Every structure is written in structure tokens, then in C-alpha cells.
């Protein structure tokens, strides 16, 4: 039986209210970017090759959250913690060896770097640094490894950028494997976002015109004795079983993910003339105990390679439904309490933690749950200050392995006096065609919103009952049109 992907999910039910994201972003290559960041490749496959970073820990679910103290290089994350920005969530990113991370091709000269924001803080600037020519890729990243004069600085002018921005930079001359550090200095907090980008400069490594990247062996999970892992090779007509390579897991050693990845890559190189697997070393393909790219011979007629599994038993399914969290909680004389209901699928350990925006834990709960169990819990916050807060839910199996993680955002707000008619011009959407820059409306959430200045003011009139993305307070893109008063 072919191995099905492990089914993991955390369903977040918020009385019909979707989650919010606050001031987070990552280096991407969706439209114009030359290379994705290290953390980006923990969640998303590389553009063009499908490569991914593995064993990234919890940050693979939150690539937009590599946030730490600003002021680099004078202050900021300490040496050895630059890639993670000192965030415990991203600690795995601080591992540093020559073969630990997927490397994206790059050339010196004009290049485009791209950021994707899940929410867009006003911005002071973006800075880009690169490692020195003689840096040691097998030591933790430190200030000594980098040229501390940024090769590119883009001013943010203390305004909100769009949800995706591109920066044109001149990349210095380098050879081989280098690391670029991209720093987004937000303007309304004492924090910055740090993304390292693993790159390999073209023209300095082996030139292999006869081989094309076509897939990769990702050691994503351990297997069991009796399982089989195999390649699925495709040509123009679909899968061609004649080019399949199978590896039977017949020893305890081979059950480990890095071991079977190495063994499968080695077997491909030994048995297939049109395929090669491993990291490039000179003009050789060398299997490694980690992710092994797969290449196909030019002119072979083969197009791509995927990995399949045959297993003795299906993987367990895990899910956790969390309901009852409100979008906002008003601060009062009594401690804030979150009344939640949990429903488990599968035997698991469920963990919930509440953090404020500065990552300070305010409440936590953990307990083993059985399949189908329904449980009501109350989390009481240790302090209540107005602003952004997060409820982080984690699922672990009975062996303590993390199966999934999700973050849900909510706000604590100060008590407010209900607005009077004199405080606003219209009750939204009344008078829609009269909305101009500065127009104030009373929205469905009871708050007042003011139409942004030009060139954003035109969005204020873009609303129908079937197109609500700019509806103040509740639309998916309301912040592009309105300021909350």
C-alpha cells in the first residue's frame, strides 16, 4: 500500500471570525525574488526545483515569525543566534554546516529580493548583509562571519509597505556557498525581523550542462522495518515504472530518515544511468545524510522524480479543534479569561499557550487527550495590557513528537465609550459614493474608521455585498483603505 501523507490539522473555529496576523513577514520568491529565505524553505518548496529544508522545528508552521531585538549589528540577536533572532520557536535555524540547508543559485550584480508580509508594519528600513569571502560555513553564524557594511539599504519612510515588495540590490562578488542576512526594521516596535538566505554563486561550482534538477529525496520521517521507499519517475506520458528505484527497509539503522535518504541516493547512482542523486562536489554527485537533490540526464526524455512509500500500517491521524476564542477582549477589573472548547482526534498531548506580542507567556495548559474527547478549559491571563496577543496550539503524539502547531491572534482592548452620531459621518455602508479621504464611518464592529488619504482613498468606495474585502474592521484587506480611530 502506498504511504499516504500524514494527516495533521488544527481547526480553529472562532464563532465565524477568521484569525488575524500582526506585523510578520519573510523573504520569498513568488514573483520576482532571486532566492527564498532559509525559514521560507522550511514551509514552502523552492521555486523551480521543489527543494525544501527539513527538521526546522516549530518555525516551519510560522515562517513569518522570526522576530527579535532590533539594532543589528550594534545590538540585535547575539552571535550564534542570528538566524533564529533568539526566538525559541526558530532555534533549529541556528544549525550551521556546509550541507545543512538548501542553497539557491545567485550571481553577483543586480538582483531582486522579495518580502511577503502576512501583515505590514510601518517600516523604518530594510538592510542586506552578506558573509565575508573567507567565512567558515561550519561555525554558528556570528558578526565576524558577515561584512557588517550592508550591501543594500532600502528606506521604509515610516509607511506601511504593500503585502509583497521587491528590492533591487547590487550583490557583491563572492564564490560558492554564502549567507545573506535580510533585516526588516519595523518602525512602530522595538523589534526587527531577521531572514538568512542560503545561496550558491553561479560560475564558481561545477558546470553540469547535461543534468537537470528534477526532484529531491527529503528525509521527512522515520520508517519501519518492512516499509519500502521508492522513486516515481515521470516522462511525457506519465509515470514510467522501468526507471523506478526501490529501497526495502530491512534493518533498524535504515529506519532513520537521514539513513534511508542516503541509501536511496546511493542506490540510484549505482543502478540508474539516466538519474543521479546527491549534493554536487566538483563534478560528482555525492549522497549525504540529509536532503539529496535528484538530477535527470539531458535528452533522456524523463521529466521529474517524486518519492513514494509502501508501509505496513497507516500513519495515525491527528487533529485538534479549538473553539470559543473571541476576536477581542475588553480589559476590566477582573483578569481576562479565555473560555475554550477542545475536541481531539487521535491519541495526543494537547498544549495551549497564550503570549503577548513580545512573546511573554501569560497562560498555559497541557494535558493528554484521547480520540474523540471533548474538553472545556479556561485560560486566565496573568496580566492584561492592550494590544496584540496570540493563542498557540500544539499537537504532540504520545512519544512527544510535534505533529502540528497553529497560532491564533486576538486583541485586548481598553474600555471604550460608545460613539455618538457626531463622531462619524456615516454608518457603513450608507453614503458609500460620498466617501473621500478623511471620511469617518461607524462599522459593524462598533468602532469608527477613517478613510485613508490618497492614493488609498479610492478603496473606501469599493464595496458590495458580494465584495467585502475593504469593509472596515472585518474585510480581508480593510487596512489598505481605513485607519481605526
Swiss-Prot record:
Transmembrane segments: none annotated. SUPFAM superfamilies: E set domains. Keywords: Chitin-binding, Secreted, Signal. One of its GO terms (molecular function) is chitin binding. Residues 1-23 form the signal peptide. Gene3D superfamilies: 2.60.40.2550, 3.30.70.2150, chitin-binding protein cbp21. It is found in: Secreted. The keyword Phosphoprotein does not apply. Residues 437-478 form the Chitin-binding type-3 domain. It comes from the Bacteria. The keyword Protein transport does not apply. GO terms for cellular component: extracellular region. CDD domains: LPMO_AA10. Residues 24-201 form the Chitin-binding type-4 domain. Probably interacts with GlcNAc residues. May promote attachment to both epithelial cell surfaces and chitin. This function enhances bacterial colonization in the gastrointestinal tract and may also be important in the environment by augment colonization of chitinous structures, leading to improved survival. Promotes bacterial attachment to, and colonization of, zooplankton in the aquatic ecosystem. Belongs to the GbpA family. This is GlcNAc-binding protein A. It comes from Vibrio cholerae serotype O1 (strain ATCC 39315 / El Tor Inaba N16961). The gene is gbpA.
Amino acid at each position: 500500500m502506498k504511504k499516504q501523507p500524514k494527516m495533521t490539522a488544527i481547526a480553529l473555529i472562532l464563532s465565524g471570525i477568521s484569525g488575524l496576523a500582526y506585523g510578520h513577514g519573510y523573504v520569498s520568491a513568488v514573483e520576482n525574488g532571486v532566492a527564498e529565505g532559509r525559514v521560507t524553505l522550511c514551509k514552502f518548496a523552492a521555486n523551480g526545483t521543489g527543494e525544501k529544508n527539513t527538521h526546522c522545528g516549530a518555525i516551519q508552521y510560522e515562517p513569518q515569525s522570526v522576530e527579535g531585538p532590533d539594532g543589528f549589528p550594534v545590538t540585535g540577536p547575539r552571535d550564534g543566534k542570528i538566524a533564529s533572532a533568539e526566538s525559541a520557536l526558530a532555534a533549529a535555524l541556528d544549525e550551521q554546516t556546509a550541507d545543512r540547508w538548501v542553497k539557491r543559485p545567485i550571481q553577483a550584480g543586480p538582483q531582486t529580493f522579495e518580502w511577503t508580509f502576512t501583515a505590514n508594519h510601518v517600516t523604518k528600513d530594510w538592510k542586506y548583509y552578506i558573509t565575508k569571502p573567507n567565512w567558515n560555513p561550519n561555525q554558528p553564524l556570528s558578526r565576524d562571519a558577515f561584512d557588517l557594511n550592508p550591501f543594500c539599504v532600502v528606506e521604509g519612510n515610516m509607511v506601511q509597505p504593500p503585502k509583497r515588495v521587491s528590492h533591487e540590490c547590487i550583490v557583491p562578488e563572492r564564490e560558492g556557498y554564502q549567507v545573506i542576512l535580510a533585516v526588516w526594521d519595523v518602525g512602530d516596535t522595538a523589534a526587527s525581523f531577521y531572514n538568512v538566505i542560503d545561496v550558491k554563486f553561479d560560475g564558481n561550482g561545477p558546470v553540469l550542462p547535461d543534468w537537470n534538477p528534477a526532484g529531491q529525496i527529503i528525509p521527512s520521517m522515520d520508517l519501519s522495518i518492512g516499509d519500502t521507499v521508492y522513486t516515481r519517475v515521470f516522462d511525457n506520458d506519465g509515470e514510467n515504472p522501468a526507471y523506478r528505484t526501490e529501497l526495502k527497509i530491512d534493518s533498524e539503522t535504515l529506519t532513520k530518515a537521514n539513513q534511508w535518504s542516503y541509501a536511496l541516493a546511493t542506490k540510484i547512482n549505482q543502478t540508474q544511468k539516466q538519474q543521479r542523486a546527491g549534493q554536487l562536489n566538483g563534478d560528482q554527485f555525492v549522497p549525504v545524510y540529509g536532503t539529496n537533490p535528484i538530477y535527470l540526464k539531458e535528452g533522456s526524455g524523463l521529466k521529474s522524480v517524486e518519492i513514494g512509500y509502501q508501509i505496513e500500517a497507516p500513519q495515525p491521524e491527528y487533529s485538534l479543534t479549538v473553539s470559543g476564542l473571541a476576536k477581542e477582549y475588553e480589559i476590566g477589573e477582573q483578569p481576562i479569561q479565555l473560555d475554550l472548547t477542545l475536541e481531539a482526534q487521535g491519541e495526543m498531548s494537547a498544549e495551549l499557550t497564550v503570549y503577548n506580542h513580545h512573546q511573554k507567556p501569560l497562560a498555559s495548559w497541557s494535558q493528554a487527550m484521547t480520540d474523540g474527547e471533548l474538553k472545556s478549559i479556561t485560560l486566565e491571563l496573568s496580566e492584561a495590557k492592550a494590544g496584540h496577543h496570540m493563542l498557540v496550539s500544539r499537537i504532540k503524539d504520545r512519544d512527544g513528537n510535534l505533529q502540528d502547531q497553529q497560532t491564533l491572534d486576538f486583541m485586548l482592548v481598553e474600555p471604550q465609550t460608545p460613539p455618538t452620531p457626531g463622531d462619524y459621518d456615516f454608518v457603513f455602508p450608507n453614503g458609500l459614493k460620498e466617501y473621500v479621504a478623511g471620511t469617518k464611518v461607524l462599522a459593524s464592529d462598533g468602532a469608527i474608521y477613517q478613510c485613508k488619504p490618497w492614493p488609498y482613498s479610492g478603496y473606501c468606495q469599493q464595496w458590495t455585498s458580494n465584495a467585502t474585502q475593504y469593509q472596515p474592521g472585518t474585510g480581508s484587506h480593510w487596512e489598505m483603505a481605513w485607519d481605526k480611530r
